[in-house]
């Protein structure tokens, strides 16, 4: 293959990737006011400026686009957790909540999608989100096992603790999305979030796990 042909192929592939991302971004914008089940293919392609048939070069269906959005949104959630682990503070819980607030503000549309579609009308997307959350729980359980005193915990107990933390985090995300940018409401959400996570942490400290 000549250099020109190779460059042309690369350019076409780059254009295809850009169009695919444009479709995801457009769907996310349109979903700010509705659910995936009510969003039409024509709405998304009109937003991007391509003909409806061109959609199928990138996704087999709107359900497949929704699964891709779920995976993209979960990458945002994972990046937030990595950020929290990478930036230890004197008060780990306050620091984690601060990072959560910051990330929800920066990536509000991703978190809105996860919260709304977790129990939404598209089965493939519900399953994709549930699968991603289970994987997240497994990763967090592995992290918890590295803490002093938790290495000998029963794996089921580690997973239970991880799932509690993930559930707590999602409830905080929902509260942040509901309260919006209002300072007083935000302060109340942060206070409740910190107390909620401290309660989980205290329970973990006093839990007597018996290895099986």
Where do the model's predicted regions map?
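Amphipathic alpha-helical packing segments from all-alpha helical-bundle domains
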Residues: 123-149, 159-175, 187, 191-202
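Hydrophobic alpha-helical connector segments
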Residues: 82-109, 155-158, 190
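Alpha-helical DNA-contacting segments of helix-turn-helix folds
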Residues: 31, 59, 63-73, 80, ...
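N-terminal intrinsically disordered/low-complexity leader segments
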Residues: 1-18, 208-212
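Generic hydrophobic, amphipathic alpha-helix propensity
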Residues: 15-27, 44, 69-77
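Amphipathic alpha-helical segments used for helix-helix packing
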Residues: 106-124, 141, 174-178
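Helix-turn-helix
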Residues: 22, 30-64, 68
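Amphipathic alpha-helical linker/stalk segments
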Residues: 8, 33, 69-96, 111-112, ...
């Amino acid at each position: 293959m000549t250099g020109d042909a190779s460059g042309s192929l690369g350019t076409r592939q780059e254009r295809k990737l850009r169009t695919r991302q444009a479709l995801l971004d457009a769907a996310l914008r349109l979903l700010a006011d509705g659910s995936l089940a009510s969003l039409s293919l024509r709405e998304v392609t009109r937003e991007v400026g391509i003909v409806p048939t061109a959609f199928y070069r990138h996704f087999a269906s709107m359900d497949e686009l929704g699964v891709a959005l779920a995976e993209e949104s979960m990458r945002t959630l994972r990046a937030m957790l990595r950020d929290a682990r990478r930036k230890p503070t004197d008060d780990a819980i306050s620091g984690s909540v601060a990072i959560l607030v910051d990330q929800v503000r920066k990536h509000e549309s991703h978190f809105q999608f996860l919260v709304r579609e977790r129990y939404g009308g598209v089965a493939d997307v519900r399953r994709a989100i549930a699968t991603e959350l289970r994987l997240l729980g497994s990763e967090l359980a592995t992290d918890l096992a590295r803490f002093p005193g938790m290495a000998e915990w029963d794996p089921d107990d580690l997973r239970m603790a991880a799932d509690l933390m993930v559930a707590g985090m999602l409830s905080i995300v929902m509260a942040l999305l509901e309260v919006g940018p209002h300072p007083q409401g935000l302060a109340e959400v942060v206070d409740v979030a910190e107390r909620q996570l401290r309660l989980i942490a205290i329970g973990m400290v006093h839990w007597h796990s018996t290895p099986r």
